[in-house]
Curated annotation (Swiss-Prot):
The lineage of its organism: Eukaryota, Amoebozoa, Evosea, Eumycetozoa, Dictyostelia. Residues 548-563 have a biased composition (Basic and acidic residues). Keywords: ATP-binding, Metal-binding, Nucleotide-binding, Nucleus, Transferase, Ubl conjugation pathway, Zinc. The dimeric enzyme acts as an E1 ligase for sumo. It mediates ATP-dependent activation of sumo and formation of a thioester with a conserved cysteine residue on sae2. The keyword Translocase does not apply. The gene is uba2. It comes from Dictyostelium discoideum (Social amoeba). Belongs to the ubiquitin-activating E1 family. It is found in: Nucleus. This is SUMO-activating enzyme subunit 2. Residues 577-607, 623-634 have a biased composition (Low complexity). It is an enzyme of class 2 (transferase). Its EC number is 2.3.2.-. Heterodimer of sae1 and sae2. The complex binds sumo via sae2.
Amino acid sequence: MSERYSHIIQALGQSTFDKIQTCKILVVGAGGIGCELLKNLVLTGFKNIDIIDLDTIDISNLNRQFLFRKQHIGMSKAKIAKESVMKYNEQVNITAHHGDVKSSEFGSEFFKQFDLVMNALDNISARRHVNRLCLSVDVPMIESGTAGYLGQVSVIRKGKTECFECQPIAVPKQFAVCTIRTNPSAPIHCIVWAKMLFGKLFGPKDDDGGGDSSSLTDLDNNIIHGTEELGNIKRDEQLLIEKEKGFKRWVFHKIFHTDIETLIHMPDLWKDKQPPTSLKLDEILSSKEVSQAEEEGDQLIFKLPDQKQWTFKENVEVFLDCLEKLKQQFDQSNSKPMTWDKDDELALSFVCSASNIRSKIFGIPMKSRFDVKSMAGNIIPAIATTNAVIGGLIVMEAIKVVDGRFDQCLSTYLYQLPSGKRLLMPTQLEPQNPKCFVCNRSFIICRLNTEKTTISQFIDHVLKKSLAVNEPILTVGNDIIYEGGDQDLSKEEIEQRSKIEKKTLATHRLTNDTSLVVEDYNQDFQITITIQHTTDFDEDTKKLKKQQQKEKDQKEGKTTTIEKEEDDKFFEIIGKTSQTTTTTTTTTTTTESDNNSNNNKNNNNNNDVEEDDGFMFIEDQPSSTTTSSATPSISKKRKEIDTNESEDLDSSKKLKSNLQD
C-alpha cells in the first residue's frame, strides 16, 4: 500500500495521507464527471467511498464515461463504476447505490455518516436536495459541473460560504410562436424555426415541431401561418417554376423567398426595424464569398471543425444537400415519419444550415454547428477533457477539506480560451447570502389569489417547482392541513388527500396574511410562507395590464412583446433569491426539449441538458439566452450559459457554474 501511494505521501505528507485514507466520501452521480472523479479518488488514496446514481448506461455514454464498455449497456452506472474503478485498487471500500438521491432512504441520517459529499450531478432538482441535506447535517460539499469547454468547482460549507441556492437559479424562457414564425430577433428563434421546418417536412402529421404537417404539399400554400387576411399578396409564379425543377429548389424558394416576401408586405412588423431580405437561389450559387479562414486567419487555430462558422453560401449548399438526402430517406422508408435527433449528423446539418440562412435573411448573426447543436437540443455538448480537468480539481479541493485547511479552499473556473495566459481562474469562496431562504431559513411571501388557487396548484407550482420541496407537509397553527408522500398512507387517506388538493387555499384558512409552515422531512428543510391574497394575476387584471402596456409602447414607438410565462403566471414570491431567465427551445404550442433519450428512459430527472454537462451558471447580469461560453462579471447574479451567445472571456471577471455530471 505504501509503495502504491509513495508519490502521494511524498507530495502531501503522511499526516494528510492518513486523513485521506480514513475519511468517508459520498459521490453523487457516476456519469462524465463522476467517472473521472472516482478514478482520481482511488488513485489518490481515498478508501471509503459511497456512490449514488439512478441512471443506467446508454450507448451514448461510452465516448466520455470511460469506466463503462459496450457490454455494460442497460446496467447500473453506480454498480459498474464501482466494479471498474476497483481494478485500480482492489483494497478500497466502495458501496454502490442504484437509486434516487432524493428518496427517503438517503435522508439526513444517511448523509451524517460522511466527512465530505461530492456532487457530480446533471440536474438542478437533485443539486438543491443534496445542498439542503448537507446544510442540515453540516457536512461540507464540493459542487461541480461542466458546460462544453467550460467548467467549475466550488466548496460549500454551512455558515462559511454561500450555498447552492444563495444565487438565483435560471428558469426557462419561452417564446411566442408568432415571434418565431414572423419576427425572429435572435439565433435561437431561427433554430427553433428550423426544427419546426424539419418536423413539417419529414415528421408525423401531428409533429410537435411543426404544428400542421399533414403532408409535404402543405408547403405549396403561398400564405404563411397568421396572414390569411392579407388578400393583396400576389401569387408567386416563380414558385411553380421552381417546383418543376425539383423538390429542394421548390422548398428553398418557398421558405426563403415566397414566405419572406409575404412578411415584407406586412409593414406593421417593420416600423422600427429593418425588414427581412428574400433570397434567390441562382444568385447565391453564382456568387463568390470570402471564407471564414480568410477573414479570421490565425484566430481559427483555437477552433475545431464544428466550431468554425460556415459562410452563407456554404450554408445554402449544405441545406440543399441535406434536403435532398433527407427526402431520399423519407421516400425509401415509405414516408415513415422522422424525429429530429441532435446526434443525427444529417438532421443536425439541416437545422444548422436552415437556421443560419434564416438568420441571414433577418440580419441575425449566424452560428457554428457546435453552437446550433447546443441550442437546438437545449443541451450542452459533453467534452471528455473538460470532465477530466474538473474531476482533478474536485480532488484537489477535497484534500484541503479533509486536511482541515478550509480557509485555503477556492472556487476554480475553467475557461474555453486562454484568459491572459490562463485557462483556470481560481477565486475566493463567496460568503453566505443573508437573503437566502435555504441556508438562512428566512421567511418569504407568496402573493396569489387564494380564492382561485387550489392546494394542488400551490404544491406543484409554488412548492415543488419554485421552491424545490419534494414531499411538503403544510401546517397552519397547530393543524396539519396537507401531508405529502405516499409511504405511510392508506388508500382511503390518499383519496382524502386527493379531495383536499382540489380545494382552494381559502377553504383551508390560507387567506390574506396567513402564516404557513412548510416542511420536508426528507430534506430536513423548513420554511415559513406568508400568504398574501391578490387579484393581480387574474385574467381580467392581466388583460388590462397588457392593454395598458400596449398603449404605452405605441406612444413610445415600441413593439409590445408578451412572453408566455407572463401569461401563465399566477403567483409571485417575495424574499426568495430572484431568478434569472434562460431561453429554451419552446413555443406557445410546442416544447422542443429533445432530452438525451437515455435520461428520459431512466427517469433521472435531467432538466433538458445532455447528461454530462449540465447547468452552468455565470455570475453575470440576467440574460435571456441559451448555452455556451459567455462573458462573466463580478456581480452575483447567475445565469445559464448560452451556447448560442458565445462571447470572449475576460480574466478580470469571474465565472460561477453549476453543471452536471
